[in-house]
Amino acid sequence: MPHAERRIAELAAQLQLTDLLDRPAGQLSAGQKTRVALAKALINRPELLLLDEPTASLDPDTGDWVRSWLERYRAESGCAILLASHNMAEVERLCDHVLMLKQGQVVDQGSPAALLAKYGRDDLEEVFLDIARGRSREEIPA
């Protein structure tokens, strides 16, 4: 089997797409289309994977499956992931470093743990809301 076909078969198996390889794209669910998009992005083993809201259109179970798969893939391959997302639970789970943006400007950055400690919050959603509301750490009630 040629290298490209082996890689397609490998990714199809990993992303649970084997039974869908001959199905037209119009017959795929949102979750299946997301997994196909991941396979297409990973076919050449990139060192950096760019993802924009990768689970936004997915049901909770499928979104969780995709996040788990991405965690495993990153750990096994060493591929860096640049993630754009409004889903702070996803960001907290998948990211080592976070840039918080407001109107296209970086207003804070750090590891999820560092941002949580800096803002005295329990989850990044609260940090995100504080930043969106323009509240600095000093303005947040204890």
PLM feature segments, named:
Residues 64-76:
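Helical segment within the ABC ATPase nucleotide-binding domain
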Residues 45:
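Conserved catalytic motifs of ABC-family nucleotide-binding domains
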Residues 2-20:
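Conserved ABC ATPase "signature" region
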Residues 24-28:
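Conserved ABC ATPase signature
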